[in-house]
Amino acid sequence: MSAPQVGVLALQGDTREHLAALREAGAEARTVRRLDELNSVDALVIPGGESTAMSHLLREFGLLEPLRARLAEGMPAYGSCAGMILLATEIADAGVAGREALPLGGIDMTVRRNAFGRQVDSFEEDVEFEGLDGPVHAVFIRAPWVERVGPDVEVLARAGGHPVAVRQGKMLATAFHPEVTGDRRVHRLFVASLS
């Protein structure tokens, strides 16, 4: 069986780190910036960055509606931090009208942006992660948390009493950045779900 073709949305954020993590996890990974690139992948990673800026860039690059359509059709996706925000069906504090973060609707959840605080409030913490042996060292940078999950959403990890990792079918999202730690278990979990 050939390796899954996984794209990393390369408009902003930890693109290189996700590409490296996906390759180490056994995927064939490449960047996605254009519609033809989006249409050529089996799954997509939406990296961290700034969710309102990423929404703006998705519109500018003509990817917003095609990406929503691919997700609605069942394309697997993994979102970290801002990627988690964008994969939500609802964003609790989307931002200023006209420059707000736009939900893509992949996971039935409500997410609050910057819920753990501003940049200076960023932190690291070991979290227990359902389905993985041992804790995951989680790096939270202006991180969101999940305020509501739908009935088909599994909560995989919590921090501060709030869900910070969730899965719905072949959609995975984390409020933290596993791509920057060298621990590839979250990426391996996502890649394994593609087979």
Swiss-Prot record:
Annotated residues for binding of L-glutamine: 49-51, 113, 141-142
Superkingdom in the source lineage: Bacteria
PROSITE patterns: PDXT_SNO_1, PDXT_SNO_2
Record keywords: Glutamine amidotransferase, Hydrolase, Lyase, Pyridoxal phosphate
Gene Ontology CC terms, in alphabetical order: cytosol; glutaminase complex
Biological process per Gene Ontology, one example term: pyridoxine metabolic process
A single GO molecular function term of this UniProt record: pyridoxal 5'-phosphate synthase (glutamine hydrolysing) activity
UniProt keyword Lyase, yes or no: yes
EC number: 4.3.3.6, 3.5.1.2
One Pfam family, short name: SNO
Catalytic activity as recorded in UniProt: aldehydo-D-ribose 5-phosphate + D-glyceraldehyde 3-phosphate + L-glutamine = pyridoxal 5'-phosphate + L-glutamate + phosphate + 3 H2O + H(+); L-glutamine + H2O = L-glutamate + NH4(+)
Active site positions: 81, 177, 179
Pathway entry: Cofactor biosynthesis; pyridoxal 5'-phosphate biosynthesis
Key word Transferase present: no
HAMAP family: PdxT (MF_01615)
Entry function: Catalyzes the hydrolysis of glutamine to glutamate and ammonia as part of the biosynthesis of pyridoxal 5'-phosphate. The resulting ammonia molecule is channeled to the active site of PdxS.
Quaternary structure note: In the presence of PdxS, forms a dodecamer of heterodimers. Only shows activity in the heterodimer.
Stored PANTHER family: PYRIDOXAL 5'-PHOSPHATE SYNTHASE SUBUNIT SNO, PYRIDOXAL 5'-PHOSPHATE SYNTHASE SUBUNIT SNO1-RELATED
Stated family: Belongs to the glutaminase PdxT/SNO family.
NCBIfam families per the UniProt record, alphabetical: PLP_synth_Pdx2
Name of this protein: Pyridoxal 5'-phosphate synthase subunit PdxT
Native source species: Mycolicibacterium vanbaalenii (strain DSM 7251 / JCM 13017 / BCRC 16820 / KCTC 9966 / NRRL B-24157 / PYR-1)
Gene name of the record: pdxT
